[in-house]
């Protein structure tokens, strides 16, 4: 039997990153659907088989979209064109360093290369489901700048499906390795699957679903038969993977991708997702009221009910699983996006508290942010890294008093190059800060009817 995958770590060049893991007032958004940028052709060193390049659909939301979300700041000390160019340049470098399609065991399959630690079960790991999710979101949002974006995206999806989970085949196993035997060998990690499913909704809005891949159908299938069936717990929480117990309270806040979950509701009509969102916000509030009332920080892992920090060395992850470390550092971006895209006021309350604390802590200087804090705000780390800095900058976008903070943070972020984990999350945050992470809006005629299926039936592999 395959050993159940707990949590694995991403070894960064600078620091260690840990991977994978209501009703609202809609925020007004202004889309620029008419701006079409010249495509950027993929580096020839990345494409190894030109026959894999196929006809692609015209982008419906080409980069740059430069959306202006109501109540959300952008860096305003430079032009929108400058912001867009910084994203393009960062993406070009990211793609050259991390985007690969050299799998001899899966021709045409793309993956995002990232070093890991953990237990790859004797395989040589090249990437993860976490990286796959990051890459799929980034690629679909950069379509229009990158003329090969759909080919790349479809290749990333090919890999995600080939490396299906050993438990629920509608999800992705957490390891990518250049070995046929690795396909279907590993169980899942919740965060990677959430990003992958969400990216499919973006792909549906970017290219439509009438081509060789029905993105909408694949997304709805993954959302309902994969994530809902295996990751949503009986208490409306999110477990750590399809190996996790459905009765557990063990969860990882970096998996609490509120705007993803709200999109899942909009594209399926299943109110389960609203219940999950409400539960996660309540868990966050109850946790911070007791353990971090001054900072608003949350720990890498949360356990039990009422919620409390996981013990140190939880799941043999790190000695800081009870603190704001390389998992929790990603949380502020996931929270603020719910306010930006859907007007969720609970997201603003959390973002405002975190931003107020970190600005005070650093005296308004983003370069003074360090890589790790105890819940009371005491330093654990000693240097800034983008996977901490950029989400803290994103949290500051909800209040006009933070304009200088956002501007300074942008200047720090835009040229910061470190490693797969930090660079990927930095790029995702740059897309948000510049208005180039747009909201997927469903076609009402194609909303899936809510389906409540038995978990066992969902886990049967489809022919």
Swiss-Prot record:
EC code(s) of this entry: 3.2.1.4
Keyword entries, A-Z: Carbohydrate metabolism, Cellulose degradation, Glycosidase, Hydrolase, Polysaccharide degradation, Signal
Pfam families with a match to the protein in the record: Glyco_hydro_8
Single GO BP term: cellulose catabolic process
GO molecular function annotation: cellulase activity
Note: One Trp residue has been proved to be involved in the mechanism of action of endo-K.
Protein name: Endoglucanase
Annotated source species: Bacillus sp. (strain KSM-330)
Lineage of the organism: Bacteria, Bacillati, Bacillota, Bacilli, Bacillales
